[in-house]
Amino acid sequence: MPRQLDRYDMSEQQGISIIMVNTEEVPGKTITKTLGVVSGTTVRAKHVGKDIGAFFKNIGGGELKAYTELLGESRDQAVQRMLEEAVGRGANAVVNVRIATSAITPGASEILAYGTAVVVE
C-alpha cells in the first residue's frame, strides 16, 4: 500500500496546495527544480494561569495538556510559515522537513520548521 503524502491547503481562498515530506524525495514524483532552504519560526511564552495548573499536574504526574496544545499550535504555525515561504518561491513541495525546538528564556520556547523547497512533477 503506498504511503500517503502530507498535503497542506495554504488557504481556501487562494486554492493553494503544497506537499510536505520528511524524506529526500516525494514518492511517485520527480524533483525538477530545487529552490533552496525555507523556514518558519515562532516563539511562544507560557501562560501564568496554565503554569499553576501544570505545577500541580507535575507533582501528581500525567500529561500537561495546556502545554501539549501550545506546542501543537506553535508547530502548526511554524510549518505554515515555512510553507508560505516555499509557495512564495514558486515551490509545490517541501522535502527533508524537520522541526526543532529550543528554550529562549525560562518561560518561552522557539519552534523552527525547515526544509528544502522544490518543484515536483
Regions found by a protein language model. Give the residues of each.
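Short, solvent-exposed loop/turn elements at beta->coil junctions and helix N-caps
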Residues: T23-V26, I99-I104
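Positively charged, aromatic-enriched nucleic acid-contacting surfaces
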Residues: A93, G107-S109
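Short, well-ordered alpha-helical segments
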Residues: V38, V43-R44, K50-R98
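N-terminal presequence-like segments and the immediate start of the first folded domain
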Residues: M1-K50, G88, I111-E121
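C-terminal structural segments of small proteins and small subunits
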Residues: I104-T105, G115
